[in-house]
Each structure stands twice: as C-alpha cells, then as structure tokens.
C-alpha cells in the first residue's frame, strides 16, 4: 500500500495511540507473520512496546521513504528529564496492515 503524507501522519497518530493503549490494540495493526526488529534484532510487537513505553511515547512526525513510511516516535524519560526521538520504519500490505517494522 502506498501512503500520501497526510495518510502517513494520520497512521502515525493511530500507531502511537495504539502503542500507548495496550498490547491488543498495537498488535491489531500488524498483518499475520509481520517481520519485526528492534535495534536490528528480531522481535515482535511487544518488543517494540517494551522499548517505547506506554504513557511515555508520543507521535513526533512522519516522512515517506517509498516503499516505507518512517514515523518518529518521541520517548520521554522523566527520570533523566530527557527525550529520545526514535525512527520506526514500516512497510504495509494492501489492506494497510504492517508487514515489516524496524524500530
């Protein structure tokens, strides 16, 4: 599926909303058998949630890098009073579900 910039931004808001909501909401964004990696290592949707904690993650922006959409997710660390903007590179199937995610 090919996204426009506006669609990518809207999906980014949905993505971070699901990330902050819970395991089931986030997992529902993925196609069966989706490839997921975190910091280059094989993972799963829960692994992504582990490194982008619910309640401390926000949508920062989207950009198109065909065939990928790159979302920037901001992770807030209140203990160190810092923020970290992390790219999440996604590929989608024809129905708009994530088939590949590199976080």
Locations of the language-model features?
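C-terminal and inter-domain tail/linker signature
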Residues: 1-103
């Amino acid at each position: 599926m090919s996204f426009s910039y506006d669609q990518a931004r809207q999906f980014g808001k949905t993505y971070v909303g699901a990330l902050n909501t819970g395991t089931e909401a986030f997992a529902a964004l993925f196609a069966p058998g989706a490839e997921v990696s975190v910091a280059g290592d094989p993972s799963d949707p829960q692994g992504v949630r582990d490194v982008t904690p619910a309640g401390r993650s926000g949508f920062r922006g989207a950009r198109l890098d065909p065939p990928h959409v790159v979302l920037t997710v901001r992770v807030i660390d209140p203990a160190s009073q810092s923020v970290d903007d992390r790219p999440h590179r996604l590929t989608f199937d024809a129905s708009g579900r994530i088939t590949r995610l590199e976080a």
